[in-house]
Each structure stands twice: as C-alpha cells, then as structure tokens.
C-alpha cells in the first residue's frame, strides 16, 4: 500500500531562506502597488500604507516586514473587492472617485 501522506511539491523543500522570504515580500509589495495604481485612488493607497505603518509599527511596535505583510493583505483584499464589483478600469476607465489624472504616485514611505 502506498503512503497516504502528501508529498512536498518540487521546489518547496523547505530549504528556502528567511532572506528569500523577505525578498519575496518586498517584490510582492512593489508589484501590488504597481497594479493598485491602475485600479484604486492614489490617495487611498497612500493612506492604507500610512495607517498600516502608524498602527502596526508605531503603536504596536511590530517590525517593518510585519507592516509590509499586513499592508499586502489589506491591498489584496481591496483589489479583490474592487474586481468582484466588476472592474472596468482598464477597458472603460474609472468613474467618479476612481483614478486621478496625474503622474504616478511616489512609493509608500519605507519602500523607496
């Protein structure tokens, strides 16, 4: 009889380093910011970052990586809800309250 337990998928041996995890986190935050500016108001993106930093880092004393993780979770949820409501941003553009004209926003503090 074969072993019923799951096998570790190739490439996921558990040998990844913590440094690779931090690199992934930084890359993913930058990628979600680049995508978010196509769908959400710049002001909202900045406010989510600022509030995440103020609460998780300044008030709760959490690490910069933890702040990025929580920010990433919030932005993923915001983009999911935006798309679930029927995103038409790339085809028809934003309606009132959506994307503001102008240059792309600067990266959130701590990510430059």
From Swiss-Prot:
Record-given protein name: Protein Vpx
Residue window of motif Nuclear localization signal: 65-72
Any one GO CC term of the record: host cell nucleus
Keywords: Host nucleus, Host-virus interaction, Inhibition of host innate immune response by virus, Viral immunoevasion, Virion
Family under the similarity heading: Belongs to the lentivirus VPX protein family.
Main location: virion
Function of the protein: Plays a role in nuclear translocation of the viral pre-integration complex (PIC), thus is required for the virus to infect non-dividing cells. Targets specific host proteins for degradation by the 26S proteasome. Acts by associating with the cellular CUL4A-DDB1 E3 ligase complex through direct interaction with host VPRPB/DCAF-1. This change in the E3 ligase substrate specificity results in the degradation of host SAMHD1. In turn, SAMHD1 depletion allows viral replication in host myeloid cells by preventing SAMHD1-mediated hydrolysis of intracellular dNTPs necessary for reverse transcription.
GO biological process: symbiont-mediated suppression of host innate immune response; viral life cycle
Native organism: Simian immunodeficiency virus (isolate Mm251)
Location in or out of the cell: Virion; Host nucleus
InterPro entries associated with the record: Lentiviral_Vpx_assoc_factor, RetroV_VpR/X
Quaternary structure, from the entry: Interacts with the P6 region of unprocessed GAG. Interacts with host VPRBP/DCAF1, leading to change substrate specificity of the CUL4A-DDB1 E3 ligase complex.
């Amino acid at each position: 009889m074969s072993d019923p337990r799951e096998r570790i998928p190739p490439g996921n041996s558990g040998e990844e380093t913590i440094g690779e995890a931090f690199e992934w986190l930084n890359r993913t935050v930058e990628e979600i910011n680049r995508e978010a500016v196509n769908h959400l108001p710049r002001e909202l993106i900045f406010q989510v970052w600022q509030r995440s930093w103020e609460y998780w880092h300044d008030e709760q004393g959490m690490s910069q990586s933890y702040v990025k993780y929580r920010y990433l979770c919030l932005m993923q949820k915001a983009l999911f809800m935006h798309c679930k409501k029927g995103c038409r941003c790339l085809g028809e553009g934003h309606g009132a309250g959506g994307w503001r004209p102008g240059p792309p926003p600067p990266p959130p503090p701590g990510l430059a």
